[in-house]
Amino acid sequence: ITLKKGKRTTSVDYTINTRREGSRERQGFNSSDMIYLIMSDRFVDGDPSNNSTKDTKEKADKNNIHGRFGGDIQGIINSLDHISQLGATAIWPTPLLGDNEAQWSYHGYACSDYYHIDPRFGSNELYCQMVEKAHEKGIKIIMDMVPNHCGSTHWWMADLPYKDWINQFDNFTNTHNCFSANYDINASEYDRLLSNRGWFDRPMPDMNLENKDLLKYFQQWAIWWVEYANIDGMRVDTYPYIEKVPASEWLAAIRAEYPNFNIVGECWTRPAPAVAYWQSGADNFDGFDSNLPTVMDFPVEEAIRQALETDGKNWGGGLTKVYDAVTMDYLYADVNKLFTFLGNHDMARFADIVKDKDPRRVKIGNVLLATMRGIPQLFYGDEYAMTAPEDPNSHSHLRMPLPLGDQVTKEQQEMYDFQSALFQWRKKEPVLHTGRTMHFLSRDNTYGFFRYNDNEAVFVFANAAEEARTIPTANYKEITSKYNTVGVNPLTGETIDLSKTDIKVPALSTLIVKLTK
């Protein structure tokens, strides 16, 4: 390719590779998967030799809680057996691309190079090896994409291709973090523009996807990574902060290339109607379609956390919150494409927020996560019920390295074994992947529901009360009458007869029963 500007001529060699065979038909992640979220720099240090490099500003310093610790791609590769044995079938690592900020670069969300892996994580070639090795174990890879903003150290910041390549102001102008302005019929134009054009943070210039060449750049960038690295999905950071029309066009281009691909967007808001607005296929009042197949289920995340952080005795508290959240399912275009979770890298660890840090409450949360509709995601370390005792609300403190070997306590191993059995079982149950849901009004801090299809059903009864509860089996006849009421607890092998009226579930525990015809 020859580039000319005035009397200057520059030639660049550009390789056009053959597309992977069958690439268009690639299958993305879906509700049969369990996603394992990794904070890349903090997870596992598999190659200490790359912790600091001459070309990157911030060096590794494990004594600095806000600094880099050395986690890397090799650490993920070394942990594939741990992840597979847990029952996870997909991995979402936080951004692995270059982030050359002088401080806080460990999080990776201030990109300095969209086409190269940060050398402290590895290389493009090693990333491809990770994908290949993961695929050999039946594990998909989801790439964390950040088109909303770049980093202040990105090379183009020294010489912007266009003045409007980024959204610029006379003085630093922060977004107000209230993206409801995008669908609020009463919103001012001032608030709407500030939502989309304000910077997420000082070292994160806001990209202007209304510039058609930038939009094309990001479309080609995303498609290139799919083809080059053979990835299985994308997670889009801060999706509603992008101008919504070009954001939809960006996703439309990707989905046109890969109709069966899946992309999940971070739409961090709690009201279900607001989350539903951003899912592709939503019947929106303004006709807008995001082209985003999957959205994160923040309403259910909040409901489960609130249900288990207290004793649930207050009016409308406890598991009633989960029941209420699920009643909003009618709002969504596709509930099987809701990304469900108990926590992530931006919120206090689940084991820290449940009442008394009780592992029994942690298990209740995990059973709900494994059996409710949607695509479950587990934050690394939660398989051990990891906590951040120094400061549970500090992002840096909750993102500590995964315990390895002798660092794993007896209690942590017991929790891992429980979750491994749970998610390995889920992996083999299509009724949990695509079955319908029938639930019953939450009473006395309990919640009973069925996932079912024409041939089988899974019954789940969660008791978050501090005393035993009797299952109101007589209330469930409208669905149990369609199956053999004698079923099996898949985690214990115990036979359970749901026609009986005296089945008690101990305090702070769950019961699962698989029914067939």
Regions found by a protein language model. Give the residues of each.
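Carbohydrate-interacting/catalytic domains
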Residues: 1-35, 77, 81-87, 373, ...
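Substrate-binding/active-site clefts of carbohydrate-active enzymes
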Residues: 33, 41-229, 247-257, 273-275, ...
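Hydrophobic faces of well-ordered beta-strands that scaffold small-molecule active sites
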Residues: 34-36, 91-93, 141-143, 234, ...
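Active-site rim elements
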Residues: 66, 208, 235-238, 350-359, ...
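Soluble or luminal CAZymes and related metallo-dependent hydrolases
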Residues: 68-75, 122-126, 213-218, 242, ...
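Active-site-proximal helices and loops of the catalytic beta/alpha 8
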Residues: 131-135, 149, 154, 221-223, ...
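Active-site clefts of carbohydrate-active enzymes
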Residues: 335-355
